[in-house]
């Protein structure tokens, strides 16, 4: 509660100026690296006196951080089980998740897979604390399948590195795959996985600072 009171007082003082104050954002490592950095760069050039604080955590944990009033807003994957009714959600882009494998170690470029057939291969994915894990497990559960990953990590980049050396088939957002990728290929599926979204979320119960408004308007 004291966090929320202090935050409200600070935002009132900063309401009409961007000559100081702070901007507090939470996002996952993947979203920070592949989406957020260019916007942070632009905002910092426009408003160099605003102190920017970025908190790195899983998308689910980011929702809890937002609810506690520790940040102005979060950028997260959606759906996200951590989001509450008090959270205002706006979509900013869509993306697809893909299974990728090394062509050298898994020469399967011509094969089209069902989810059932994928279970015959070592699947690598983010750990259970992530929205990506929630999403993939729910897809398998809808088909009455039990997914038991070979490897669970907290980094999409590391999953991609392990896929390149043939340790398994990695499940990652498509925007993590370099455009000039030569070692990995995207597996073809007989079932189309739903599109997910990146969303910006703020707590409707808290005042939004001028800095946060300006940044969210850039997205």
Residue ranges, per PLM feature:
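Alpha-helical "hinge/linker" immediately C-terminal to small N-terminal DNA-binding modules
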Residues: 1-14, 98
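Central regulatory/effector-binding core of bacterial HTH transcription factors
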Residues: 20-83, 152-153
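A late-sequence structural motif
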Residues: 35, 186-219
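Secondary-structure junction motif
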Residues: 107-108, 121-143, 208-216
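Hydrophobic hinge/microswitch elements
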Residues: 58-71, 77, 131-187
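Short beta-strand->loop
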Residues: 88-98, 174, 182-197
């Amino acid at each position: 509660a004291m966090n929320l009171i202090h935050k409200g007082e600070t935002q009132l003082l900063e309401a009409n100026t961007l000559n100081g104050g702070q901007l507090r954002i939470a996002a996952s490592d993947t979203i920070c690296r592949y989406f957020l950095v260019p916007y942070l760069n632009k905002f910092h050039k426009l408003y160099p006196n605003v102190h920017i604080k970025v908190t790195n955590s899983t998308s689910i944990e980011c929702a809890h951080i937002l609810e506690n009033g520790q940040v102005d807003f979060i950028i997260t994957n959606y759906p996200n089980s951590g989001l509450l009714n008090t959270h205002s959600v706006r979509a900013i882009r869509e993306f697809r998740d893909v299974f990728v494998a090394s062509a050298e170690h898994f020469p399967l470029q011509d094969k089209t897979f069902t989810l059932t057939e994928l279970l015959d291969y070592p699947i690598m994915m983010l750990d259970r604390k992530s929205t990506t894990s929630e999403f993939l497990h729910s897809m398998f559960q809808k088909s009455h399948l039990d997914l038991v990953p070979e490897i669970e990590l907290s980094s999409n980049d590391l999953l991609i590195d392990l896929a390149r050396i043939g340790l398994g088939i990695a499940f990652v957002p498509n925007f993590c795959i370099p455009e000039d990728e030569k070692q990995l290929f995207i597996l073809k599926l007989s079932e189309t996985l739903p599109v997910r979204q990146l969303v910006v979320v703020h707590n409707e119960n808290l005042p939004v600072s001028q800095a946060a408004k300006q940044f969210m308007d850039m997205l």
